[in-house]
Amino acid sequence: MMPPTRLAGTLIPAMAFLSCLRPESWDPCVQVVPNTTYQCMDLNLYKIPENIPTSTKELDLSFNPLKELGSHSFSNFPELQVLDLSRCEIEMIEDDAYQGLNHLSTLILTGNPIRSLALGAFSGLSSLQTLVAVETKLSSLEKFPIGHLKTLKELNVAHNLIHSFKLPEYFSKMPNLEHLDLSNNKIQNISHEDLRVLHQMPLLNLSLDLSLNPLEFIQPDAFKEIKLHKLTLRSNFDSIDVMKSCIQGLAGLKVNRLVLGEFKNERKLERFDTSALRGLHNLTIEEFRLAYIDNYSSKDSIDLLNCLADISKISLVSLDLGNLKDFPKGFGWQDFELVNCRIEGFPTLELTSLKRLVFTSNKDMKSFNEVKLPSLEFLDLSRNRLSFKSCCSEADLKTTRLKHLDLSFNDVISMSSNFMGLEQLEHLDFQHSTLKQASDFPVFLSLKNLRYLDISYTNTRVVFHGIFDGLVSLQVLKMAGNSFKDNFLPNIFREMTNLTTLDLSKCNLEQVSQEAFCLLPRLRVLNMSHNNLLFLDMLPYKPLHSLQILDCSFNRIVAFKWQELQHFPSSLASLNLTQNDFACVCEYQSFLQWVKDQRQLLVEVEHLVCAIPLQMRGMPVLGFNNATCQISKTIVGGSVFSILMVSVIAVLVYKFYFHLMLLAGCKKYGRGESIYDAFVIYSSQDEDWVRNELVKNLEEGVPPFQLCLHYRDFIPGVAIAANIIQEGFHKSRKVIVVVSQHFIQSRWCIFEYEIAQTWQFLSSRAGIIFIVLHKLEKSLLRQQVELYRLLNRNTYLEWEDSVLGRHIFWRRLRKALLDGKPWSPAGTADAAESRQHDAETST
């Protein structure tokens, strides 16, 4: 053992050495992009790491206790373009802290409690475009030393302590400023003097966000003649009177987009009156957006729309419009959005100048009403759960100019016409709506100009081969999640010579016609994933001279045949074969070698695994050894024979093991009394019936029966098979078998049933009671031959969910369970008395 003095002499220098080590000297940063992007987030760094290359362009140092930034703190990174210093506990930034960062375009200082900010703190940032100083305890824009940042485009100082909206003179030196975020500050009043800079030097592209400021007063004419790109005022007003006064204070403003309203979780107005918006007449607005305003009547809804009559673009989000059936006519709207609003029924629309209508995710929608929109070019009616009794033609929409139609995520759409009068359509989306009669006739015959079609997950069953006739200009076709007759893909793409993208995933396809893709010379992307293809016959893909991406993942592909590999499109750049059932056997040696040779072509080739033979299941396909296929036939034959013999012996031993367990149990428990009246065999899918009906009526009835249930009576930590035999069969007088569709499809249930047969043979007292829970198809029942024969030869109980049927069922079942049960009058009386006592207590 080392003497104490010697041990201390060894440990003290080691501890001194370790104490000198800093986390930054351990190279803890994550290299996202070599020599370019590094992430050092939340590594407890106390200073800027020195081991990061000087070529770094993006550096994330957020959530490190840097405390302060001294002069030339980042001089080692002259190429830096993005710097994130969020929540680094920075309290002081000295002069020239960022000196030398001539290429820095984005600087993020969010969440730093800055107390001292030198006048030259941001010097040297000659290319800075985005500065984020959210939650930095900034109290005034005038004290923010950024007047020299002439290239600045975005300034975000939200969630600070700014009380004055006065824009400093240095804003006149920022001609490129496009976005100023002052939201969630302490601004209450806005005067003409505050905006003097904008009066002197207009910033025409400036977007100004003043949301979540407790505005109380805007001086009249403060915004007069000012031009803004966007102004956002959300959750600013405590009362409708303040809102009305402030909107009147905006008189004379010229703004491309005005956003008013509240936030979903920041509601201040107790009520809303559309009179507050009347002051909008004094503004010049191109686009208006109102969000999260409620608590007003249907009349107010009409008044609201009347207030917006002179605006060309309207967007209403998350409003309660109530019973607004008839929209006002004669408005000059060109663009109208109604998103996530509650409105009782689809409104009648007659707007002659409207070109774009977005009506999505609205509540209380049922059916679509005809509209009269002669100038409409863009129509989005998605996510409304609408039903369309007739679709689609000029008669439904009263327009011939439509180019974009989105009816996705709705209810039932009946295809009654082939888009007569809508020949200008270029984009059509039906995904996740239920299409009816879509495969009865050439429904798309008139759409010569259509370029995009999505009928994914529309419950379409393709029977008619001319379903896509007429789509001569189509470039993208998505039809995932549908089905084909006999799970066979025929030649239904006969006129789509311009098609570039085709999605046939999740269509249950098993075979592909040799001519399926023969007329698709421009196809570049083909998705055949999540189907049931057993062999990938490459002959149908041979005409696809432009194919670059082929996805055949999640199929049941065993292999390719050697002759099929010769038909591979030479243009193919990516082939996805992951999640298939590859056979790693010598019969497909050529294919397995081809996989090794095509590693660059195959997606995630290292994840291709063998499914058969069993001894190679889960092994990488790349690990298959071709040398094993050269062994002599004698060795192969002998090996196969040995494997078969071992397998047979193993099966016999397995079967014999359970017979021994049963036989031993019968000898052990044969003379004693059984603990349980019956062991219940059932599928876990039928557990609700077992718990709520079987257990309740038998264990709580008179006389009570004790059932053995796996979820309650099996011993934890013991193998399932051992529990079934020792706790289930050996300790029970009888066995109840609950037969259902789930039972027949469950391997565990069939295993328990087979053991029950052996148990009945070995035990003279044993009895099996069959309960058929639901009507079973004979084709399904014949899958279990012994069970089918047994049910034909023996009586069984059949569950009927009716008063008479239940009475007969429980009477017959109790009679069967009483057979051989030791009689205990006292126990029966006690049970009856207990039931009577419970009934009186509940009363």
From Swiss-Prot:
<dbReference type="InterPro" id="IPR001611">
    <property type="entry name" value="Leu-rich_rpt"/>
</dbReference>
<dbReference type="GO" id="GO:0046696">
    <property type="term" value="C:lipopolysaccharide receptor complex"/>
</dbReference>
<comment type="similarity">
    <text>Belongs to the Toll-like receptor family.</text>
</comment>
<feature type="repeat" description="LRR 10">
    <location>
        <begin position="375"/>
        <end position="398"/>
    </location>
</feature>
<keyword id="KW-0675">Receptor</keyword>
<feature type="topological domain" description="Extracellular">
    <location>
        <begin position="24"/>
        <end position="633"/>
    </location>
</feature>
<keyword id="KW-0391">Immunity</keyword>
<keyword id="KW-0399">Innate immunity</keyword>
<dbReference type="GO" id="GO:0061809">
    <property type="term" value="F:NAD+ nucleosidase activity, cyclic ADP-ribose generating"/>
</dbReference>
<dbReference type="GO" id="GO:0002755">
    <property type="term" value="P:MyD88-dependent toll-like receptor signaling pathway"/>
</dbReference>
<keyword id="KW-1003">Cell membrane</keyword>
<feature type="glycosylation site" description="N-linked (GlcNAc...) asparagine">
    <location>
        <position position="282"/>
    </location>
</feature>
<feature type="repeat" description="LRR 13">
    <location>
        <begin position="449"/>
        <end position="459"/>
    </location>
</feature>
<dbReference type="GO" id="GO:0001875">
    <property type="term" value="F:lipopolysaccharide immune receptor activity"/>
</dbReference>
<comment type="function">
    <text>Transmembrane receptor that functions as a pattern recognition receptor recognizing pathogen- and damage-associated molecular patterns (PAMPs and DAMPs) to induce innate immune responses via downstream signaling pathways. At the plasma membrane, cooperates with LY96 to mediate the innate immune response to bacterial lipopolysaccharide (LPS). Also involved in LPS-independent inflammatory responses triggered by free fatty acids, such as palmitate, and Ni(2+). Mechanistically, acts via MYD88, TIRAP and TRAF6, leading to NF-kappa-B activation, cytokine secretion and the inflammatory response.</text>
</comment>
<dbReference type="InterPro" id="IPR035897">
    <property type="entry name" value="Toll_tir_struct_dom_sf"/>
</dbReference>
<feature type="repeat" description="LRR 16">
    <location>
        <begin position="522"/>
        <end position="543"/>
    </location>
</feature>
<feature type="repeat" description="LRR 17">
    <location>
        <begin position="546"/>
        <end position="569"/>
    </location>
</feature>
<keyword id="KW-0967">Endosome</keyword>
<keyword id="KW-0472">Membrane</keyword>
<dbReference type="GO" id="GO:0032497">
    <property type="term" value="P:detection of lipopolysaccharide"/>
</dbReference>
<dbReference type="Pfam" id="PF12799">
    <property type="entry name" value="LRR_4"/>
</dbReference>
<feature type="repeat" description="LRR 8">
    <location>
        <begin position="227"/>
        <end position="247"/>
    </location>
</feature>
<dbReference type="GO" id="GO:0050829">
    <property type="term" value="P:defense response to Gram-negative bacterium"/>
</dbReference>
<feature type="repeat" description="LRR 12">
    <location>
        <begin position="424"/>
        <end position="445"/>
    </location>
</feature>
<dbReference type="InterPro" id="IPR017241">
    <property type="entry name" value="Toll-like_receptor"/>
</dbReference>
<feature type="repeat" description="LRR 6">
    <location>
        <begin position="176"/>
        <end position="197"/>
    </location>
</feature>
<feature type="transmembrane region" description="Helical">
    <location>
        <begin position="634"/>
        <end position="654"/>
    </location>
</feature>
<feature type="region of interest" description="Disordered">
    <location>
        <begin position="824"/>
        <end position="843"/>
    </location>
</feature>
<dbReference type="Pfam" id="PF01582">
    <property type="entry name" value="TIR"/>
</dbReference>
<feature type="repeat" description="LRR 5">
    <location>
        <begin position="151"/>
        <end position="172"/>
    </location>
</feature>
<feature type="domain" description="LRRCT">
    <location>
        <begin position="580"/>
        <end position="631"/>
    </location>
</feature>
<feature type="glycosylation site" description="N-linked (GlcNAc...) asparagine">
    <location>
        <position position="626"/>
    </location>
</feature>
<dbReference type="Pfam" id="PF13855">
    <property type="entry name" value="LRR_8"/>
</dbReference>
<keyword id="KW-0677">Repeat</keyword>
<feature type="signal peptide">
    <location>
        <begin position="1"/>
        <end position="23"/>
    </location>
</feature>
<dbReference type="GO" id="GO:0032731">
    <property type="term" value="P:positive regulation of interleukin-1 beta production"/>
</dbReference>
<feature type="repeat" description="LRR 1">
    <location>
        <begin position="55"/>
        <end position="76"/>
    </location>
</feature>
<feature type="glycosylation site" description="N-linked (GlcNAc...) asparagine">
    <location>
        <position position="205"/>
    </location>
</feature>
<dbReference type="GO" id="GO:0042116">
    <property type="term" value="P:macrophage activation"/>
</dbReference>
<feature type="disulfide bond">
    <location>
        <begin position="391"/>
        <end position="392"/>
    </location>
</feature>
<dbReference type="GO" id="GO:0006954">
    <property type="term" value="P:inflammatory response"/>
</dbReference>
